[in-house]
Amino acid sequence: MEVKDILKTVDHTLLATTATWPEIQTILDDAMAYETASACIPASYVKKAAEYVSGKLAICTVIGFPNGYSTTAAKVFECEDAIQNGADEIDMVINLTDVKNGDFDTVEEEIRQIKAKCQDHILKVIVETCQLTKEELIELCGVVTRSGADFIKTSTGFSTAGATFEDVEVMAKYVGEGVKIKAAGGISSLEDAETFIALGASRLGTSRIIKIVKNEAIKTDSY
């Protein structure tokens, strides 16, 4: 697989709590230069970033991030605000307390409400696979499919682990037609990126692939 084809799947990501505007600018510049799928950045930078790229790059942001246990009303507001500010794509975190209580109907209803606000904007649903049993992940594949979301996403990158090959294999087997897969967190090599794509992921959330391409790969515990 050619590097340019891998880059087309990448949501070039910077979600560090201390991210500065010059750092965000670098993410945006690199994403445009290497023609990634989007740049994924904190919501507080969306308006400025959208103005900066002026339609040359899709802007992705996160809501309910990273813990997911804010109320549905709060997430709906975050979604509306992000889109109003110029976000093209929304990555939302589900409420894992609902999952652990077995209340999958509430999870599905929340996703439906947010998808309704997204309208034609892309919605990706972060399920935080490292916190799930295999049975819970399988159930959530059905929930995300029924909710009308565009993607199911493995991880925030802020929990105990990121994407694994095994989890993406499960998603590819159980998610419904029309729902795509985003692998995120800990993707640190072109080889891993290519494997995730081969297993069924059509998006990759990472900050490292461009660094590798630029021969600037560094070892880090961040997203």
Curated annotation (Swiss-Prot):
Q: Where is the active site?
A: 91 (proton donor/acceptor), 153 (schiff-base intermediate with acetaldehyde), 182 (proton donor/acceptor)
Query: For this protein, what is the EC number?
Result: 4.1.2.4
Gene Ontology CC, one term: cytoplasm
One example GO MF annotation: deoxyribose-phosphate aldolase activity
Family named by the database record: Belongs to the DeoC/FbaB aldolase family. DeoC type 1 subfamily.
**Source organism (scientific name):** Streptococcus pyogenes serotype M12 (strain MGAS2096)
- SUPFAM superfamilies membership: Aldolase (SSF51569)
Q: GO biological process annotations for this chain's record? A: 2-deoxyribose 1-phosphate catabolic process; carbohydrate catabolic process; deoxyribonucleotide catabolic process
Compartment annotation: Cytoplasm
Q: What gene, per UniProt, encodes this protein?
A: deoC
HAMAP family hit by this protein: DeoC_type1
Reactions catalysed, as given in the entry: 2-deoxy-D-ribose 5-phosphate = D-glyceraldehyde 3-phosphate + acetaldehyde
**Job of this protein:** Catalyzes a reversible aldol reaction between acetaldehyde and D-glyceraldehyde 3-phosphate to generate 2-deoxy-D-ribose 5-phosphate.
UniProt pathway? Carbohydrate degradation; 2-deoxy-D-ribose 1-phosphate degradation; D-glyceraldehyde 3-phosphate and acetaldehyde from 2-deoxy-alpha-D-ribose 1-phosphate: step 2/2
Q: Lineage of the native species?
A: Bacteria, Bacillati, Bacillota, Bacilli, Lactobacillales
Mind telling me what this protein is named?
Deoxyribose-phosphate aldolase
Question: What does the UniProt keyword field contain?
Answer: Cytoplasm, Lyase, Schiff base
InterPro entries assigned: Aldolase_TIM, DeoC, DeoC/FbaB/LacD_aldolase, DeoC_typeI
